Swiss-Prot record:
Stretches assigned to the Tyrosine-protein phosphatase domain: 1-112
UniProt keyword Hydrolase, yes or no: yes
Signal peptide coordinates: none
Keyword line: Hydrolase, Protein phosphatase
EC number: 3.1.3.48
Protein origin, superkingdom: Eukaryota
Gene Ontology CC terms, in alphabetical order: cell junction; cytosol; plasma membrane
Lineage of origin: Eukaryota, Metazoa, Chordata, Tunicata, Ascidiacea
Protein name (record): Tyrosine-protein phosphatase 8
Biological process terms in GO annotation: signal transduction
Family stated for the protein in its record: Belongs to the protein-tyrosine phosphatase family.
Listed InterPro entries: Prot-tyrosine_phosphatase-like, PTP_cat, Tyr_Pase_KIM-con
Broad EC category: hydrolase
Length: 112
């Protein structure tokens, strides 16, 4: 949907599986899902979250590419809230700066 950012606030596994690994995790890794090739172009570890720059290539549409920023806040506990909110608030602020005017833009929504 032409989204610029994905925000994930769960671990892949906590006692049991919470989320499937739907993308590669390391810089330079590629996965192919049907006609979409997903490549991690950059990984940046912030204090409380990780940001991955992902290039999505549509192999059926002249190899058209789209950049997506994946924010992963993995400190949210299974049945609790974070003890300290600074990391979560910093993440929200960074996403807001990256996607400042979604309502009046050609880009899709932030996916949470």
């Amino acid at each position: 949907e032409n989204s610029t950012a994905i925000v994930m606030i769960t671990k892949l596994k906590e006692r049991k599986e919470k989320c499937s690994e739907y993308m590669p995790l390391k810089c330079g890794e590629k996965h192919t899902y049907e006609n979409f090739e997903i490549e991690i172009k950059n990984v940046r570890n912030a204090d409380h979250y990780t940001v991955r720059t992902i290039e999505v290539r549509n192999t059926e549409e002249d190899n058209a590419t789209h950049t997506v920023y994946h924010y992963w806040y993995a400190e949210w506990l299974d049945h609790d809230t974070p003890e300290k909110l600074r990391g979560l608030l910093t993440l929200i602020q960074e996403v807001g700066l990256r996607c400042p005017d979604i309502a009046n833009s050609e880009y899709g929504p932030v996916v949470v």
